[in-house]
């Protein structure tokens, strides 16, 4: 059965191929021939029921692919590109003759917009290649389509000639159905274009052609006007360069011409398409412009960012600077040690410290004297303790200001070079205390001083004087001592007499005093005098309730008499180290200070014994043994 089937199929297929070739030659449309084949071979198929219907194949003639562009678009592109190429060649020749050499764009425009120059050069190269290629392709298509001259410009749409892209518009397209059943038949479907769609396409194509022709005409007019104006400008520039001075009328004419050039250039703007964006560029012709206008000219590219105004930049920068904190601001530490602090911040001088120290010292001493009165309350003792604290603190402040070092320097210089410092300056070096209303107090007199040649050793310890152990005069007695036995300081007036505490508070006998060095013997004498004065004051306080203030005047008179007697008998004072006979003679002649005691006072002294004297001695030693400027750093 397989052999018969293969033999029976072979002549039928051959016959159908021959019939198809004949129909193709006569121009008859192709169609299936299944019914003819079935009519002739019906007996054979009826005899063999198992044999299926044969598969038929039809040949389809494929039409050649049409071009992607319409004839109208090809012609318009050829005409436009040819005109552009001619115009560019003319401009290149003019620039080469004038020596510009930049190509397409001025030098200042190249500096302002280098991206514009690169775009123009790239576009010119691409357009030249495209124009040459399109011209060749257009000529070949025109020669190939001369046979079918029935078509007119604008009647065919671009991208619609390809029959394969839209299968519904192809009249030769047919659908073949393959059937394996006995009663299946193939049918062909023919679709034709509608008349309304054809009319709309013709109207659109006509509008496109008219727009292309208008662009061509406007471009030709602009090119001719630009060439004419550029020639006129070159002629005027050459004439203006030959002449040395140009009148105001000529400058106005040149400005008018420049305005015309700008208007024509602005009208002759063209658009270039890069991808999906349209970029507006100036025309290729760039007429000569004055330098001030060329500096003001800016590139007209839409995609180039415009620089912001300078005022806005300055405002933003100033605003930014105001908000930023400076790094170099001076910083002050939270705490400054006492050593690093400036003395000027306290506004305290050395004189202020000295006066405060001395005044507080004598206030303390006077308070201690009045503190022995049993009628006083406990507030006096508290005040005395506070005064002692003030004295110690002020003494330490005085040492920090280095006043002691300065005083020692002045003293050393005065001892080594006594004639170098005048008496007026030497007086100023000695610290004094005086009333506010009184003049400066003169230093103690030196008339009672013993000459240096009279003693070769200390009067108290007999230590010989050498280069290292120097001689020191006591300002009160005038004798010569070593440094170890001349270390006390007390106030003396101009006659080298002691100034007591009460007198110092009242301004002193002579209106003030000077702080001077005294020996140990003079200190004992001062203590005895202070204790005597204290006893007299305490007794007078008890009597003043009845007698009044008459006793105060008596005490002052007694003190004055004491000083007069002391001055008279200063030469007859006994000296340590002398013989017993000398002491005896001196004791006979010397006078002691007058001590006035009442009967009640003598009785009190007899009852109490030596307890009160011991207490007074302790008080006197405390007052006189510590110098006024003593502090912890003087060891």
Swiss-Prot record:
Q: What is its main location?
A: membrane
Entry keyword set: Membrane, Metal-binding, Phosphoprotein, Transducer, Vacuole, Zinc, Zinc-finger
Which residues in this protein are found as Phosphoserine? 46, 53, 73, 113, 124, 148, 165, 174, 300, 309, 381
* Comp. bias intervals (Polar residues): 67-85
How changing residue 626 to A affects the protein? Increases activity in presence of glutamine
Domain description: The FYVE-type zinc finger domain contributes to vacuolar localization.
Under what name is this protein listed? Glutamine sensor PIB2
Organism of provenance: Saccharomyces cerevisiae (strain ATCC 204508 / S288c)
Its taxonomic path starts at: Eukaryota, Fungi, Dikarya, Ascomycota, Saccharomycotina
């Amino acid at each position: 059965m397989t052999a018969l089937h293969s033999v029976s199929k072979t002549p039928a297929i051959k016959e159908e191929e021959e019939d198809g070739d004949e129909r193709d030659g006569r121009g008859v449309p192709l169609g299936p021939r299944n019914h003819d084949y079935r009519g002739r071979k019906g007996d054979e198929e009826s005899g063999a029921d198992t044999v299926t219907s044969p598969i038929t194949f039809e040949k389809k003639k494929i039409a050649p692919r049409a071009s992607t562009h319409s004839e109208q678009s090809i012609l318009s592109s050829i005409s436009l590109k040819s005109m552009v190429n001619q115009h560019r060649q003319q401009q290149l020749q003019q620039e080469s003759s004038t020596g510009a050499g930049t190509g397409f764009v001025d030098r200042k425009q190249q500096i302002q917009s280098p991206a514009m120059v690169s775009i123009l050069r790239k576009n010119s190269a691409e357009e030249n290649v495209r124009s040459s290629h399109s011209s060749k392709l257009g000529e070949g298509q025109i020669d190939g389509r001369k046979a079918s001259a029935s078509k007119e410009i604008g009647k065919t749409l671009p991208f619609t000639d390809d029959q394969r892209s839209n299968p519904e518009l192809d009249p030769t397209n047919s659908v073949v159905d393959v059937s394996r059943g006995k009663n299946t038949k193939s049918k062909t479907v023919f679709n034709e274009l509608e008349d309304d769609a054809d009319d709309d396409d013709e109207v659109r194509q006509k509008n496109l052609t008219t727009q292309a022709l208008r662009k061509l005409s406007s471009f030709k007019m602009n090119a001719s006007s630009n060439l004419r104006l550029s020639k006129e400008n070159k002629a005027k520039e050459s004439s203006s360069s030959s002449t040395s001075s140009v009148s105001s009328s000529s400058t106005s004419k040149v400005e008018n011409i420049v305005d015309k050039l700008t208007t024509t250039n602005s009208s002759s703007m063209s658009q270039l398409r890069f991808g999906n964006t349209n970029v507006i560029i100036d025309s290729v012709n760039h007429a000569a412009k004055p330098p001030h206008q060329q500096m003001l000219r800016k590139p007209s590219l839409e995609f180039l960012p415009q620089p912001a105004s300078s005022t806005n930049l300055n405002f933003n920068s100033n605003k930014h600077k105001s908000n930023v904190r400076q790094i170099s601001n001076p910083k002050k530490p939270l705490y400054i040690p006492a050593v690093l602090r400036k003395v000027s911040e306290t506004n305290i001088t050395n004189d202020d410290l000295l006066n405060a120290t001395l005044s507080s010292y004598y206030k303390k001493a006077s308070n201690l004297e009045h503190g022995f009165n049993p009628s006083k309350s406990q507030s006096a003792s508290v005040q005395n303790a506070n005064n002692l604290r003030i004295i110690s603190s002020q003494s330490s402040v005085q040492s920090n200001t280095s006043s002691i070092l300065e005083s020692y320097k002045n003293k050393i210089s005065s001892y080594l070079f006594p004639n170098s410092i005048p008496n007026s300056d030497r007086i100023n070096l000695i610290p004094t205390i005086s009333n506010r209303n009184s003049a400066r107090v003169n230093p103690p007199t030196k008339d009672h001083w013993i000459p240096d040649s009279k003693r070769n050793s200390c009067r108290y310890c007999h230590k010989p004087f050498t280069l290292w152990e120097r001689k020191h005069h006591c300002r009160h007695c005038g004798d010569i001592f070593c440094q170890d036995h001349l270390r006390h300081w007390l106030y003396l007036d101009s006659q080298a007499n002691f100034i007591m505490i009460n007198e110092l508070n009242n301004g002193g006998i002579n209106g003030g005093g000077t702080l001077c060095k005294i020996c140990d013997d003079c200190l004992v004498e001062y203590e005895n005098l202070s204790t005597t004065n204290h006893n007299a004051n305490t007794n007078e306080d008890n009597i003043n309730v009845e007698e009044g203030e008459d006793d105060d005047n008596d005490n002052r008179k007694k003190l004055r008499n004491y000083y007069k007697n002391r001055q008279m008998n200063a030469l007859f004072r006994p000296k340590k180290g002398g013989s017993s006979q000398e002491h005896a003679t001196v004791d006979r002649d010397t006078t002691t200070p007058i001590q006035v005691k009442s009967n009640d006072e003598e009785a009190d002294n007899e009852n109490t014994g030596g307890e009160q004297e011991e207490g007074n001695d302790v008080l006197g030693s405390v007052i006189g043994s510590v110098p006024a400027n003593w502090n912890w750093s003087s060891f």
